[in-house]
Each structure stands twice: as structure tokens, then as C-alpha cells.
């Protein structure tokens, strides 16, 4: 059943200011391609952008071809979107012959074997980041690792948690913030499938993308692509950005200590599969950081992550254990192909509303069996979410209801939260977002996945992609800087390059010593 939040809404209506300073941040990945939609395999242009190791706002993900744009956190949605646009414009204007691939699923037609792993210089820190990516390549292959997405970082203000504690937990030793975020995460797994339903934008792939992958999907063929007629986000499926560690670690998100222990178990538990890959190659060079279930905590691919800022050389598990959960990272957003920066304001506003709802709605602790039961609902949405009258389970007793009924029920709840947030800014932005998106459940042709699939059916993946990335290149070029200036970005480029050199000079350990000290405990 969908939890009732009426009493919590009344409480929020009496205390609206506790939502005043929500902090948000965005991370957007984008592949560099040429005019033909072929991935560019040249080295990351450090001389034009800055150091991928130390730049505050622009870096690389898995490969030299896969850019990552990072905004600082801010309480203003407009600020982070303008900031994101500024960094896109800077790179766009500096890489004259290059384009940002506008989809999550990478173009696969050429040169997959020659994709270059990201390089971060000669420091131990830089080398271990490259080694981690080498391990990912051996474990999961190149294609999975160059899938692009958008991550949304979200945290509620401290004053919210202070008020929340007064009505929930009298025990001063109780970590209200961490427990509140864990409640959010459990509800996110129960109901967060609305995100790929509304915003999923990877309904089709190229045949090469699934080559040598075992699956039971009955793909249809058209225009050189494979697609599922009702799918929303193949990126989130078992063909995309996933691994099997989540099943072996028995995650439930019932307590912080339980989650930290699961992370540490993944880091320390040997994997027969990864041991068979070997730790070293024939020349004695490392192939991966270790042969355990996880090389680092970042390898645990989930739809949402509890996060805490890291101190120098600190692991995520240590940071969470020592200081609790500071924010959550939403990882279920595909690249939005209908905007030049991969994400738009409506998506941010919907996520704000839904994540607040996930905190307000009661979320009892769950078993590992229940957790995987919820994942099955995600799988249904991901692979056939737009199918007419499609039903999903609403509890483990096989009670079902339609996606439309459940989705609209949640959106009606979000209207109440929208009214409160809009009252803080004297506009109707959140309410308008709800009014627009609730229609998607009755009219799935409005969803991103169906709109994109219709374009693919007419023009194919490459022509659709080219039409979009050429348009966005011109749009970004014509845009003016709003938050950052060109001078700011040039200064950060030079500063980051100098910072990388300084880190390289300060190393005192050789690489094996460094690896043993920080990664083989």
C-alpha cells in the first residue's frame, strides 16, 4: 500500500520554513563524438579544459572520451542549472570539432576496442583512479562503462532534521539525519520507479551493445537498432549499468551500521570470478585494484547512494561510520536528450518533491527478500513500463495495481508538498510541474522514452543524435555565461593543472606501497 502522509503534510504546512534551504547538485556525463556520431578517442584535452584529477567542475569518468560536469551544491535550482550550462559552454567552445552525444546509450559503430581509459597523471592518486577503471574494463567490459547518466545530489537542511527529531525521536543519541535518509532510500526503492517511467530515455540500443550478453528480451528491429516497444530505460536494466554484487551483499538499508558493514564486506570478500581475471597481467602490471567483490565502494552500482563528504584518503564506509549520511545521490536519471545539458528544471523540481515525500512517508524496515521484490517492480517499469494497463506488485502478497493508479496517487500527494515549496518562493513552479507530469501516466506518449523512440523510428539513432548534438552545439555557442565567466573557467583550468603537478611532486611512496596502504587493508 502507498503510505499516508496527511499528518506529515499538516506538520509541514505549520513549519514551511524548514524546507527553505534544500541543497542540490548535479553531475552530468557526456561522451565526446565527431560530426558522424563516432566516439572521439583522442586524449582528454587537458591544455584546453584543465586537469581531470583536480578540476573542481569538469573531469572524466571511465574513459578519456567520457566527460563529467559537476556543479557545486546550492539552494537555488536556477543557479545549478545555469552553472551546468556555463561549464558545458566552456568545453563546447574550446573543443570546436567535437559534440556531446545526447543519449545515455553510447554509439557503438566503431573503435570500441581502442577506447582510452581515463588518465590522471603520474601521482599515486592519479594512477589508482586509472587502475580502478582498468579493473572495471576487465570486469564488465568497455560498453557498460561508457553508458552516460545524470546524478542528482540532494540534502534537506539541518533545521528540517532538528524539527523532525522533535516529533520522532526523543533519544539524543539517535542519528535522526541518517535514519531519515535511510527511510528515504527504502521508499525510493519501493516507489522510485516513477523516475524511469517519467524520464527514462534509453528505449533502444544498437545490436553491438548486446553482443555476447545473455538475455531473454524479445527485441524488435528497425533502422539498425533493437528496441522493446514499451521500455523506458534500458540503461537501468541488466543490460546496462549494473553488477551482481548488490545481490551478494544483501542490502536492505535498514540501518547505517548494516549498510557500512555490507560495503566493507564487498571490499574485503574475495570473488572467484574476479580472481580468475588475475591481479596482474603477463608483464607484472596490475589489472585491477584487488580481486574482491568490489574494488572500491564506488563499484556498487545502485539506483541511489547514501553519501558523506570524504576527508583526505578516507573511504566512504569510514566517512559514513564516523559522520553519518550527509546527502543522497540519485542515480536513476538517463541523459535527457531534449536539453543541451542533459537535465532540465522539471526533472529537478519533481525529484525535490518526490524525495521529500520519501522522507515523510512511513517506511518500515525491510528484508533482503522484500528489497529484491521492489527491484522487480523497477525491472517491470524499465522494460515494459509504458504498456497499456501494466500492473506492478504493491506488496509481497502479490497484490497488484496499475502503474497509472499508483503513479497518479503519488503525484496527488506531491501537489501538497508543491504548494508548500511554492509558498516559499512566491511562484507556482512546483505545482505546474505536478500538473504537467501527472498527465504522463494517462498519456504515456508524453514520456521521454516514447517521444525519443518515435524519433528513432523515423530517423534512426544516429540521425536523431546528430540533429540534436549539432543543434545543442550552436545553442551553447550562442549562450552567454551566467554564473561563471570565461576568465573564471580559464583560471580554474590553470589552477587545476598546477594542483596536479603539486600532488605529483609530493608523493613519497611508490605505487605498490600506496596501494597496500590505502586499498588492501
Swiss-Prot record:
GO terms for biological process: glutathione biosynthetic process. GO terms for cellular component: cytosol. It comes from the Bacteria. It is an enzyme of class 6 (ligase). GO terms for molecular function: ATP binding; glutamate-cysteine ligase activity; metal ion binding. Pfam families: Glu_cys_ligase. Pathway: Sulfur metabolism; glutathione biosynthesis; glutathione from L-cysteine and L-glutamate: step 1/2. Keywords: ATP-binding, Glutathione biosynthesis, Ligase, Nucleotide-binding. It catalyses: L-cysteine + L-glutamate + ATP = gamma-L-glutamyl-L-cysteine + ADP + phosphate + H(+). The keyword Signal does not apply. Its EC number is 6.3.2.2. Belongs to the glutamate--cysteine ligase type 1 family. Type 1 subfamily. PANTHER family: GLUTAMATE--CYSTEINE LIGASE. This is Glutamate--cysteine ligase. The gene is gshA.
